[in-house]
């Protein structure tokens, strides 16, 4: 590889770097535009975040450029190293001496310096492009900042309106769907409860009729009692004791059946029938005195059986008490069922109240939607558009005023030049006045120029007044815009409050659903309890049959007691027993009457207690309903208050619109008045000018000069005021400083390019020196060959003749000295002179290494 190829590689590297820089700058510009578009909304609010992201993008771009530069530098280094290796290979064919390592190190250093300089150039070029882009942005922003900010605010407002409209629409659609679903669920639950209630009522009525049907009728019991009495009379008339026992057993079984199925009144009637039978037995006692002895033995047996019968009666009384307890439990279950039914009815009434509340809620929502539509119609969009148009007009007027001010500045500069000329002319006039007194024409000319200056000063003053007035109007309009946006934010907060109220209503509806589910569960529990009641009734029937069987087993004892009573012939004992029995019967009848009265009293008290509990539950339900109605009324009043507030706000918005219109009319009137004032001021100014002309014609040149100085002072004050109004001069100075910095960086860049050119020239010189070194090396080889030849000749000459040893000795010494000098010169070139030359060419500062930024070299 030749040096031309090496330099072509370097040129390709520089071209590639320039192209890659152009591409990277293009991509960087695209990234910057994308970032600006992405952060368009937050350009004013979060400018720091935008600048940070831009800095990160620039850093990534610079790093990628460095990596590409390192890759290309490595390729160039490999090409140069191949070139050097080829050179040394070509030289190694002529000599076996290895090349010194110092040459390669020097080339390494040279290449590293070249690559560093190119990397610095690329970085400087990137920084220059970045600074130019920032400078361009700042110039655009400084030329028209109000338009950029206004455009950004308009886009942000449009995006916010679109987002708000989309969210509002989605929320309303979702709320509508939720309300429709909830209403459908309520209707289904109400249909289920309405279809279930008549079924439950019919089932309960059927159960009551079955119970009534199972109970024995009073007529049947009376008929059975008459038949038993008639059979007993026939048996007594017959007097057959053998057949009497069987018939008595049958009658006793029938009596037991009747007693088991009859109530306490039937038992009293049966006891009275037994008393009548005992009285009838008194007539039979006279006929049974003969059988008294036999009956005594039987009497003892009867006493034992009587004891057994009393024990069985106690057992039957315990069973009856258990049955009464079970009946009480059944009555309690029925009371619980009635209470649950009542709660179900209350829940249905609450559901009706909830439906009424939902209807009122829908009505309120319709009113709110109407108000929202009215508010969206009155959404201050028109006012905002009007205000924005007015602000834009004001900004245009301000821009025109700024342009006028710049024009006035130019005019002022011109006037300053004219004033300088006037001063110069004044000096000339003074010289002429010294020579001869001035004429009236010069005085008229000066007065005319003075009048023009006064008019220009008045125009400047009026324009500054207009500028201040427009700035105040702009500030007032901006405050109005902020107030309107604040009112709109308040409306949004009220809407959020209404949404929270809707969520509360939804939670109440969920509570109603939960109550409905609980009532359904309680209905299931009632059904289970009804099944338990039926099971208890079945157990009662079974126990009733068992009692009948037990009473059938006790009929033998009763028959023996009757036989004992019939056969007892002892009148005294029988009378005593009969009297005692009658007394016991009367006491029992009285106790039964008292028990019946107590039972009636207990039933009445229980009924009163039940009615009281029902009334208490009804009162509690009514209280709950009253509380719910109060809460609903409070919510309704709050809603109505909110609606009234919204209506008031709508009226206030209408008033604000009307006020805006009135203000616009007032503005037009004020503008007309300002125009009239301008006309009056113009006329007054004309009159003042005429008066000043009349006065100045009578003045001397010195007074004109003094007035001119005063006007100059006024011009200087106006300049100071103009500089205070605008700060563009500071921006201009800052931009000029940036331009100076950029120009300095460009100068540095040009210096670096000059250094690169100088390095290329130094590389060429180094190549020339390497060529000279090759020539010297060839001469050195030739001298070595000559030395070898002379040595050979001396060796042959020594063998031929030894006549002149001193001659040969001096010649050989001369040749050795020449060879030593050549060796020293070549060694000095290879070891000292060439590295010094390379270091001098590279001009590497002390402390630097041959490694690059990436650490590859």
From Swiss-Prot:
<dbReference type="GO" id="GO:0005737">
    <property type="term" value="C:cytoplasm"/>
</dbReference>
<protein>
    <recommendedName>
        <fullName>Median body protein</fullName>
    </recommendedName>
</protein>
<dbReference type="GO" id="GO:0005200">
    <property type="term" value="F:structural constituent of cytoskeleton"/>
</dbReference>
<feature type="coiled-coil region">
    <location>
        <begin position="169"/>
        <end position="546"/>
    </location>
</feature>
<dbReference type="GO" id="GO:0097593">
    <property type="term" value="C:ventral disc microtubule array"/>
</dbReference>
<keyword id="KW-0175">Coiled coil</keyword>
<dbReference type="GO" id="GO:0097591">
    <property type="term" value="C:ventral disc lateral crest"/>
</dbReference>
<feature type="coiled-coil region">
    <location>
        <begin position="571"/>
        <end position="793"/>
    </location>
</feature>
<dbReference type="GO" id="GO:0097568">
    <property type="term" value="C:median body"/>
</dbReference>
<dbReference type="GO" id="GO:0000226">
    <property type="term" value="P:microtubule cytoskeleton organization"/>
</dbReference>
<keyword id="KW-0493">Microtubule</keyword>
<comment type="function">
    <text>Structural component of the ventral disk involved in maintanance of a domed conformation of the disk required for proper attachment. May have a role in immobilizing the microtubules between cell divisions.</text>
</comment>
<keyword id="KW-0963">Cytoplasm</keyword>
<dbReference type="GO" id="GO:0097592">
    <property type="term" value="C:ventral disc overlap zone"/>
</dbReference>
<dbReference type="GO" id="GO:0005874">
    <property type="term" value="C:microtubule"/>
</dbReference>
<keyword id="KW-0206">Cytoskeleton</keyword>
């Amino acid at each position: 590889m030749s040096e031309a190829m090496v330099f072509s590689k370097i040129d390709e590297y520089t071209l590639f770097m320039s192209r890659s820089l152009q591409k990277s700058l293009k991509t960087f510009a695209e990234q910057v535009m994308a970032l600006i578009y992405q952060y368009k909304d937050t350009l004013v609010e979060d400018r720091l975040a935008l600048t940070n992201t831009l800095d990160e993008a620039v850093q990534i771009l610079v790093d990628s450029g460095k990596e590409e530069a390192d890759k290309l530098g490595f390729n160039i280094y490999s090409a140069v190293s191949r070139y050097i290796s080829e050179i040394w290979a070509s030289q190694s064919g002529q000599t076996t001496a290895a090349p010194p390592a110092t040459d390669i190190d020097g080339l390494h250093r040279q290449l590293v310096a070249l690559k560093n300089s190119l990397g610095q150039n690329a970085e400087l070029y990137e920084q220059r492009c970045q600074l130019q882009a920032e400078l361009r942005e700042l110039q655009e922003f400084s030329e028209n900042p109000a338009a950029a900010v206004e455009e950004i605010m308009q886009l942000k407002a449009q995006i916010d309106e679109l987002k708000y409209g989309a969210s509002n629409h989605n929320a309303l659609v979702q709320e509508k769907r939720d309300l429709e679903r909830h209403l459908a669920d309520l209707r289904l639950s109400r249909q289920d409860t309405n279809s279930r209630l008549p079924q439950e009522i019919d089932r309960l009525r059927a159960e009551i009729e079955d119970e009534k049907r199972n109970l024995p009728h009073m007529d049947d019991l009376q008929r059975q009692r008459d038949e038993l009495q008639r059979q007993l009379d026939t048996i007594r008339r017959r007097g057959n004791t053998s057949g009497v026992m069987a018939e008595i057993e049958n009658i006793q079984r029938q009596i037991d059946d009747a007693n088991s199925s009859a109530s306490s009144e039937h038992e009293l009637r049966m006891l009275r029938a037994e008393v009548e039978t005992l009285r009838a037995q008194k007539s039979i006692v006279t006929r049974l005195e003969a059988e008294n002895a036999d009956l005594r033995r039987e009497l003892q047996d009867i006493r034992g059986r009587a004891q057994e019968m009393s024990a069985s009666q106690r057992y039957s009384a315990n069973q009856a008490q258990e049955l009464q307890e079970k009946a009480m439990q059944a009555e309690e279950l029925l009371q619980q069922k009635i209470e649950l039914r009542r709660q179900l009815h209350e829940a249905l009434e609450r559901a009706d109240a909830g439906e009424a509340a939902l209807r009122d809620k829908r009505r309120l929502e319709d009113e709110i939607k109407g108000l929202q539509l009215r508010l969206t119609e009155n959404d201050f969009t028109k006012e905002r558009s009007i205000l924005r148009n007015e602000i834009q007009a004001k900004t245009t007027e301000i821009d025109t005023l700024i342009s006028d001010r710049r024009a006035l500045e130019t005019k002022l500069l011109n006037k300053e030049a004219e004033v300088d000329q006037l001063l110069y002319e004044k000096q000339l006039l003074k010289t002429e006045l010294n020579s001869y007194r001035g004429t009236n024409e010069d005085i008229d000319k000066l007065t005319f120029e003075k009048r023009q200056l006064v008019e220009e000063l008045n125009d400047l003053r009026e324009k500054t007044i207009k500028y201040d007035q427009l700035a105040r109007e702009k500030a007032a309009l901006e405050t109005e815009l902020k107030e309107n946006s604040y009112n709109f934010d308040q409306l949004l907060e009220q809407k959020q409050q209404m949404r929270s109220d809707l969520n509360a209503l939804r939670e109440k509806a969920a509570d109603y659903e939960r109550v409905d589910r609980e009532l359904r569960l309680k209905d299931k529990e009632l059904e289970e309890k009804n099944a338990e009641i039926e099971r208890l009734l079945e157990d009662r029937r079974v126990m009733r049959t068992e009692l009948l069987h037990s009473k059938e087993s006790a009929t033998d004892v009763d028959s023996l007691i009757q036989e004992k009573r019939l056969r007892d012939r002892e009148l005294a004992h029988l009378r005593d027993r009969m009297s005692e029995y009658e007394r016991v019967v009367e006491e029992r009848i009285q106790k039964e009457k008292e028990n019946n009265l107590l039972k009636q009293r207990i039933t009445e008290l229980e009924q009163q207690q039940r009615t009281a509990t029902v009334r208490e539950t009804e009162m509690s339900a009514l209280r709950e309903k009253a509380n719910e109605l109060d809460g609903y009324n409070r919510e309704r009043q709050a809603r109505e208050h909110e609606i009234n507030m919204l209506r008031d706000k709508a009226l206030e918005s209408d008033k604000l619109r009307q006020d805006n219109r009135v203000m616009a009319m007032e503005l037009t009137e004020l503008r007309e008045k300002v125009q009239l004032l301008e006309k009056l001021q113009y006329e007054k100014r004309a009159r003042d000018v005429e008066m000043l002309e009349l006065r100045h014609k009578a003045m001397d040149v010195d007074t004109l000069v003094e007035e001119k100085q005063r006007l100059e002072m006024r011009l200087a004050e106006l300049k100071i005021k103009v500089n205070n109004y605008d700060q563009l001069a500071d921006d201009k100075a800052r931009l000029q400083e940036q331009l100076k910095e950029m120009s300095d960086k460009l100068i540095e860049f040009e210096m670096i390019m000059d250094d690169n050119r100088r390095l290329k020239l130094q590389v060429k010189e180094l190549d020339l020196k390497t060529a000279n070194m090759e020539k010297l090396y060839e001469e050195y080889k030739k001298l070595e060959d000559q030395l070898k030849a002379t040595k050979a000749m001396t060796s042959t000459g020594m063998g031929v003749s030894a006549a002149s040893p001193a001659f040969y000795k001096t010649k050989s010494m001369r040749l050795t000295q020449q060879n030593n000098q050549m060796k020293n010169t070549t060694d000095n070139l290879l070891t000292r002179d060439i590295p010094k030359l390379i270091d001098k060419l590279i001009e590497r500062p002390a402390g630097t290494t041959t490694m690059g930024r990436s650490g590859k070299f």
